[in-house]
Amino acid sequence: MSVDEAPSTAVPDRELPAAVRRIGQVSWVREPLDDAVRNGGRGRRTVIAAPAVATLGTPADGEKFALLPEAREPGTVFMMGDNPDLPRFPLRPSLGDFFRLRFGGGSAAHLLQSAKLALEHGLDEKVIMACLLHDIAIAGLISSHHGHWGAQMIAPYVDEEVAWAVEKHEALRYFADESVGYSYPEAYIAYFGPDYEPPEYIRREAEDARKHRWYMTSRLVTINDIYSFDPAATVEFGEFEDIVGRNFRQPADGLGFDDSPVAHMWRTMIWPNNFL
């Protein structure tokens, strides 16, 4: 029996092998192997095209539009909706669901270890929450200006001080404050080079943050940040369920579906591969 003739009930969905290969520089196609079984033998090539933010300044710039002819191939579509290679979300997603279902092992471990360190230091729950969420944008959305993106994502659901701390840690991390025990991270010397100088707008933002009444909340995020996290350490999101319950306003309809001004950001993490 050929793959095209295989019955749709032959293999449970989550046990299907991933038939994914790269096309172009940073784009991917799911070949019919999986979908032929899943869709009752109809078969469908599904193209995943990288967004502009992932390709600008690289040889793959413009690749998304170069892939448009792929849709003319019989049985070929661009990815929209659930990607079978990603875990599906429940009807009303919670913050914990994003940690478990979207944030990669390294990103989730980084956030959880930072929050654990703040917890072990006996810090205020607002600081612990800010540590838990400080790189949430990197974990599931975007790296550039991640403090600002992250602060916007969580603003409707946390205390204003927590969102402010997440936003300002992005600038403060570049500038030492030895009076409170924060030195410039050695990891940054390796990441960016010993001659890296933050742009002037970042310097101004850090200077303004140091004058703010919530400065130490954000500074404590940088102090408890794990710049080189321990891959052997195990910290579970469940350790923070009570703190999250007291400090994160979970929307009744679920993150991404509460009609908030930032719901689209959470939906983007649910369906990160949508063509549009």
Residues covered by each model-derived region:
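Metal-dependent phosphohydrolase cores
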Residues: S2-G43, A49-L276
